[in-house]
Design a protein with these regions (language model features):
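Class I S-adenosyl-L-methionine
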Residues: 1-18, 23-25, 30-126
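Short hydrophobic alpha-helical segments that form membrane-spanning helices or hydrophobic packing faces
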Residues: 23, 136-137
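Short, flexible loop segments at boundaries between secondary-structure elements
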Residues: 129-136
Length: 137
């Protein structure tokens, strides 16, 4: 990317307890103007709720991302592409975006797929590891 763009952060929020967010995750969430979060069909955003238990997100833009649970890989890929496109619109405006994800973003995480799309498109991107449920017990 030649123009100044924002950075995408894939942020792990751990297995459910807001006290298990890493210091790095808290710092990035405090300093990032746009928070992206997976949203269920019923409108629930569990990862965002966990983050809110650790960080005051007042005044931040929330970008809900909808993902399919389809068994069809092409349908899932289309869902990831749509989410990446929504995030990239913010990045092009120079705004950093933190996508919250349950557990650790490097292990079976939706954020990992979005990270790969965004990185492939040439935007700066970072993964912030977190506490897994196995490590939390």
């Amino acid at each position: 990317m030649s123009e100044q763009t924002g950075t995408f952060y894939a942020v792990s929020v751990g297995p459910g307890d807001p006290e298990l967010l890493t210091l790095q995750a808290v710092r990035v969430l405090e300093n990032t103007p746009v928070i992206a979060a997976p949203q269920t069909a019923s409108g629930q955003m569990l990862a965002l709720d966990i983050a809110r238990g650790a960080v005051d997100l007042t005044g931040k833009s929330v970008l809900p991302l909808r993902f399919t649970m389809s068994h069809d890989a092409a349908v899932r890929a289309e869902s990831y592409r749509a989410a990446a496109t929504a995030v990239e619109a913010e990045l092009r405006q120079g705004r950093d975006v933190a996508m919250v994800n349950l557990g650790d973003v490097a292990l079976f995480a939706t954020a990992y797929y979005i990270f790969a799309e965004i990185e492939r498109d040439g935007f700066p991107a970072r993964m912030l590891p977190g506490v897994t449920s196995v490590a939390a017990v």
